């Protein structure tokens, strides 16, 4: 984690604080610790938002997919069908061949592969569906800096 902090101008303490915000939920949706730490450091470094703010945004992002998997309709009216349809329009299927939700790191990886083929309006609409209107800018920052994250 020290190397990650040095590479992103974020302190180990800052990264740890941000990870504490969303690590438990990230694990439940299939995001590895390494992916979580790298995503947090990337967005913190590129936006200069605090790790606390970015960690909260990621917690919301991952809670959305978890709630949808449980069959809930989100406050903004998003359902699993709408979420899935938004990603399907760019060729990303959130379910595997057995109709189970894919791991979040795989969904993000597939989304990142398609991101640059979208225009800005499409990127914004997709990010708002996936992350919600209050937290979508952090997802945009992650997608825009995906090569740095990897």
Regions found by a protein language model. Give the residues of each.
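Amphipathic alpha-helical interface segments used for oligomerization, scaffolding
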Residues: 1-149
